[in-house]
């Protein structure tokens, strides 16, 4: 009897896991973590704060359409060339699949959104790059869309504002992507020769071929705080010159101190600053 008792109690017990159907789950996208200080915030409140962290003031990437909404008069934006998409001119393996994946993820056709809008009643041409799409890299379509809106602004005598956010030229398009550096610069030269205003607004990050072309040749060059701006990477430069670079090298504040920017503007002051600049440089209409 006692032998049977101890034998039964020594047998391994089996447990059954019961799923809790009432388990509370946080809906996807309701919270956002700051990439710098790691603070978790309500996404809705963060969006209302223009994606600026409440804790550390870090300027989190702002999607193209959100930025356009933040700087324009309500319902004044008219988009150009919305359906234009990249082909695969070099038959680069996997390139088309990556483009389609980014299109689904971002609801964008390419890495830049262009069009016309008004700010305090002043009409202007605008292009806004979005680093979520192929890291904002500049390929044939990005260059073409930017050139088209610049040429439209030149023809209709409009000021032009461009927000850059890019990792540089798109490697999958090779020399075709590099050609966009010269192509966009030529369109900007015609715009400048017409006596029209070009405001370049550099956001994080603006690097490579974009920083070496249209992003750096504005009549007025602005940037957001702490934005990374440069051509080659920090490590590449240090290895090339065999010197240690300053800690704040390639930041917006460093460029401002060395005369390469006109002003570093907090995102909450972005709309007001642009409105003032557009009004100050507004073309005076001559009497007939």
From Swiss-Prot:
Binds 1 zinc ion per subunit. It is an enzyme of class 2 (transferase). One of its GO terms (biological process) is fatty acid biosynthetic process. A zinc finger (C4-type) spans 34-56. Zn(2+) binds at residues 34, 37, 53, 56. Component of the acetyl coenzyme A carboxylase (ACC) complex. Biotin carboxylase (BC) catalyzes the carboxylation of biotin on its carrier protein (BCCP) and then the CO(2) group is transferred by the transcarboxylase to acetyl-CoA to form malonyl-CoA. The keyword Transferase applies. Its EC number is 2.1.3.15. This is Acetyl-coenzyme A carboxylase carboxyl transferase subunit beta. Gene3D superfamilies: 2-enoyl-CoA Hydratase, Chain A, domain 1. Its main location: cytoplasm. Acetyl-CoA carboxylase is a heterohexamer composed of biotin carboxyl carrier protein (AccB), biotin carboxylase (AccC) and two subunits each of ACCase subunit alpha (AccA) and ACCase subunit beta (AccD). GO terms for molecular function: acetyl-CoA carboxylase activity; ATP binding; carboxyl- or carbamoyltransferase activity; zinc ion binding. InterPro entries: AcCoA_carboxyl_beta (IPR034733), Acetyl_CoA_COase_Trfase_b_su (IPR000438), ClpP/crotonase-like_dom_sf (IPR029045), COA_CT_N (IPR011762), Znf-ACC (IPR041010). It comes from the Bacteria. It catalyses: N(6)-carboxybiotinyl-L-lysyl-[protein] + acetyl-CoA = N(6)-biotinyl-L-lysyl-[protein] + malonyl-CoA. GO terms for cellular component: acetyl-CoA carboxylase complex. The gene is accD. Pathway: Lipid metabolism; malonyl-CoA biosynthesis; malonyl-CoA from acetyl-CoA: step 1/1. Belongs to the AccD/PCCB family. Residues 30-288 form the CoA carboxyltransferase N-terminal domain. It is found in: Cytoplasm. Pfam families: Carboxyl_trans, Zn_ribbon_ACC. Keywords: ATP-binding, Cytoplasm, Fatty acid biosynthesis, Fatty acid metabolism, Lipid biosynthesis, Lipid metabolism, Metal-binding, Nucleotide-binding, Transferase, Zinc, Zinc-finger.
